[in-house]
Amino acid sequence: MNLTGITEYDEVNEKHFVDSLSIVKAIDIENIKTVIDIGTGAGFPGLPLKIVYPQLHVVLLDSLNKRVKFLNTVIEELGLKEIDTLHGRAEDYARQTEYREKFDLCVSRAVANLSTLSEYCIPYIRVGGIFISYKSGNIQI
């Protein structure tokens, strides 16, 4: 299906799963209840966060329907609850009151440059919430 350019097992493990979970070094994940993953692609980082922290309510948003269909299959196969997918553009859903300022945490990885990504993501974060952009291999607080 070609959802990611990384195909080697060790590389997938490190660059997708470990990288997705690295934010727990920077935030208190136990205080997070709701997460939206903008431009989720194959489900990273939102899917690993949901698997390891099942108490989270996660929304995975992507503009490509083939990715959303894939994610729906994964969610069903894994029997995950409290996880939703959205097919569409981040800037469009951000205008909807159902999603605007509703999330404790907004994450995004490899979507756009930081200024554009901030415009996409910040509308989703509630007051006091957190926006994390996965932009390098190092965690900076």
Question: Residue ranges of each PLM-predicted region?
Answer:
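Class I SAM-dependent transferase core
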Residues: M1-I36, K66-K69, T73-L86
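Flexible, active-site-adjacent loop/turn segments at secondary-structure boundaries
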Residues: T4, D10, K15, A42, ...
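Active-site phosphate/pyrophosphate- and oxyanion-stabilizing loops and adjacent acidic/basic residues
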Residues: L21, L47, E119
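Conserved beta-strand elements of the Class I
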Residues: I36-I38, L105
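Short, glycine/charge-rich beta-strand/loop segments that flank catalytic centers
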Residues: G39-A42, N65
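Conserved SAM-binding loop of SAM-dependent methyltransferases across substrates and taxa
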Residues: A42-Q55
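S-adenosylmethionine
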Residues: H57-V59, S63-I141
